[in-house]
A protein has these predicted regions:
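Structural motif
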Residues: 70, 114-117, 156-161, 206-210, ...
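Loop/turn-rich, solvent-exposed surfaces of beta-rich toroidal or solenoidal domains
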Residues: 241-279
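Short coil/turn segments that connect the beta-strands within blades of beta-propeller domains
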Residues: 57-58, 103-104, 146-147, 196-198, ...
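Blade-loop segments of beta-propeller domains
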Residues: 78-102
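Surface-exposed loop and turn segments in beta-propeller and other repeat-based domains
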Residues: 32-42, 82-90, 130-134, 169-185, ...
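Beta-strand-rich domains and repeat architectures in extracellular enzymes and scaffolds
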Residues: 39-67, 261-266
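Conserved beta-strand positions in repeat-built beta-propeller and related beta-rich domains
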Residues: 62-66, 107-112, 151-156, 201-204, ...
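Repeated scaffold domains used in trafficking and secretory/extracellular systems
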Residues: 47-52, 92-98, 135-145, 187-191, ...
Length: 329
């Protein structure tokens, strides 16, 4: 069964893309940097360990493993530091992924404390006292809706748990036959993105993007192997001997104005993580739109702001790079 998904999809894929493998429209466009920011004010420098960035309602938010949680304005000037490392009010320990809702409330997963914390634009709100006992996919995007957290989980029959007050109230999105391997739990990690009237479930190591309704119905599915520049990347995961490891192809994911953006890796020669894939859901399917290559080789996270700019965190240079994206339809 391990090879069924890849073998079947590779056969179908080779037939379906053989005529377009050299299509110029499938090749990534090289982007130029418009701005670079590596420090805030006179004394706060960004570290190389930034797991998440988001832009919402004119502000930008970042988590830094070394320093905590920051709120910035649209020009990337510091508004406030919203957390403390160590004991005390607003404590965080290895702040990881987070989600900002329409009311500027930030739900942050405290990886070291194994619980969620909540922040407003410029202050700490409260910490969830209940540790989450689920086996969470800690490196994945999640979202909140109606007071509940939608989070990817590992090792069960379902890919998504809905969590309130530390308790699982609902499980959704069954594992996919022929795609998920019970012997490789790590491969079941998924990014979750809230869309318009649906949400997206995106594999980190498996080439699958799914759209679901909020009542758990699958609406559409896309196989990332259909994108020629990712075909050989996913082939490496098929050949892994370890039963609990994988190559992380989709490092980060983001949803903005009807488009799904994926930060993807490649392993040909020197490791790189600098290509943005753009997808769009139409009535009943998900389609490839375009791809962009960022200037440097290694990026940990990114987001898209209201000005259609990509804010990408460069791990090597410990900086936020700003790119103006071409308009897509």
């Amino acid at each position: 069964m391990k090879h069924f998904f890849y073998s079947a999809f590779f056969l179908v894929t080779m037939l379906s893309i053989s005529s377009c493998a050299m299509d110029e429209g499938m090749k990534p466009v090289n982007l130029s940097v418009d701005n670079v920011v590596s420090k805030f004010g006179d004394s706060i420098f960004l570290s190389s360990q930034v797991p998440c960035i988001d832009a919402k309602n004119g502000s930008v938010y970042i988590t830094d493993y070394r320093a905590g949680v920051y709120a910035l304005d649209s020009k990337l000037n510091l508004i406030s530091k919203m957390s403390n490392i160590g004991r005390g009010f607003g404590e965080v320990n290895r702040p990881a992924k987070f989600f900002v809702d329409d009311n500027n409330v930030i739900t942050l997963y405290n990886e070291g404390l194994q619980r969620y914390s909540y922040f407003e634009k410029d202050s700490f709100l409260m910490a969830d006292n209940a540790s989450v006992k689920e086996n969470l996919a800690k490196s994945c995007r999640f979202f909140t809706r109606d007071g509940a957290i939608y989070q990817s989980v590992l090792g069960g029959k379902f890919l998504v748990s809905v969590i309130k007050n530390g308790n699982v109230t609902k499980q959704m999105c069954p594992t996919v036959d022929g795609v998920d391997f019970p012997s490789n739990v790590a491969l079941s990690e998924r990014h979750l993105l809230e869309g318009d009237n649906c949400f997206y479930v995106i594999g980190l190591g498996l080439p699958i993007v799914q759209a679901y309704s909020f009542d758990g119905r699958e609406l559409a599915r896309f196989n990332l192997v259909n994108i020629p520049l990712l075909e050989s990347v996913y082939a490496k995961n098929e050949n892994l001997k370890s039963s609990n490891s994988y190559y992380e192809v989709v490092r980060d994911a983001y949803y903005k104005n009807g488009f799904i953006y994926l930060l993807t890796s490649s392993f040909e020669g020197k490791y790189k993580c600098n290509t943005i894939i753009v997808l769009k859901k139409n009535a009943d399917n998900i389609q490839y739109v375009s791809a962009y290559t960022l200037k440097n080789n290694l990026y940990s996270t990114f987001c898209i702001n209201d000005q259609n700019e990509c804010l990408a965190v460069c791990s090597k240079n410990s900086s936020i790079e700003v790119y103006k994206l071409p308009k897509v339809k």
